[in-house]
């Protein structure tokens, strides 16, 4: 009996889900391994949270913001509702605040794995996504922000991704201004206008802070120019600290990575539901899609900063790497020769019988080399 149905419909997968075939799957695995090795070299220890958790655990606290993107199902054993993670950050926060509460701080953790998101009806997008990231838990400082961003930049550089840009934002800066003077009932239209970068609507809805918000709109762009414009504003005492932290974080990043391209969007609020300070989105000139995002948040009651990269997006942005050469070898090749091929970087494909025409079989199996006269010979 076949392990799967051989009807034509067997190849049909739900929208947003896809098989990764050998070349793609291997490239993604190599990319994740490269990123995780970069994190490990800098002291970030790997953890592996489960794909499923009880709904009350996964979506409690700041995880509540993930509810609209979460698949749910009933546990047939406990009859409790469970949820498939749409993001791993809240799981890392749980591990840090409960399982590793006695571990020394700063706590540096890394992770990788698959997530499942509900997606947006009518839009074609991945609903099974890969994540690989780091979280720095304990310190609340510009240097901690800079460490996370600089390490993310190093990981991308090792993949050969060029034209990388880190777009910084500080949602609390504009939100602090708005909450101080704009009635709650009038805030949503103003936030929507800022999100659309609609200067005329902001001027109409901004009331006494319309001028400051207009400067913030104009400030979006290269970090140095943005900071110069933002520094010209007269902030209330309870808001000025957000600007000072943004400037300090940029300076700390520059110190670690002088050549890193930084931009600032002071009125970017999209997707920063549980973040409390500096936020970052990663882009590249070689791709139109977002490569990753992160920022500052609370892990339980502790300050934390993290960055989550999207390996599938990284794969599309990175240059195509040469695949491992494949050598077709005889069924009875000795162990020493096999070991030598593996150390030289070859994948070996073994014959299952004594072939009359090894070269023909090697080509059939898409090998690049064949074992002949005691060595790997190119086909």
From Swiss-Prot:
Q: Give the main location.
A: cytoplasm
Entry keyword Cytoplasm: yes
SUPFAM superfamilies, sorted: Class II aaRS and biotin synthetases (SSF55681)
- What's a single GO CC term here? cytoplasm
Subcellular localization: Cytoplasm
A Gene Ontology biological process in which this protein takes part is: histidyl-tRNA aminoacylation
Q: Which InterPro entries match?
A: aa-tRNA-synth_II/BPL/LPL, HisRS-like_core, HisRS/HisZ, HisZ
**Example GO molecular function term?**
histidine-tRNA ligase activity
Q: Which UniProt keywords apply?
A: Amino-acid biosynthesis, Cytoplasm, Histidine biosynthesis
Q: In which pathway does it act?
A: Amino-acid biosynthesis; L-histidine biosynthesis; L-histidine from 5-phospho-alpha-D-ribose 1-diphosphate: step 1/9
Instruction: State whether keyword Cytoplasm applies.
Output: yes
Family per similarity comment = Belongs to the class-II aminoacyl-tRNA synthetase family. HisZ subfamily.
Q: What else is known?
A: This function is generally fulfilled by the C-terminal part of HisG, which is missing in some bacteria such as this one.
Chain's role: Required for the first step of histidine biosynthesis. May allow the feedback regulation of ATP phosphoribosyltransferase activity by histidine.
Subunit structure, as described in the record: Heteromultimer composed of HisG and HisZ subunits.
What protein am I looking at? ATP phosphoribosyltransferase regulatory subunit
What organism is the protein native to? Gluconobacter oxydans (strain 621H) (Gluconobacter suboxydans)
Organism ancestry: Bacteria, Pseudomonadati, Pseudomonadota, Alphaproteobacteria, Acetobacterales
Name of the encoding gene? hisZ
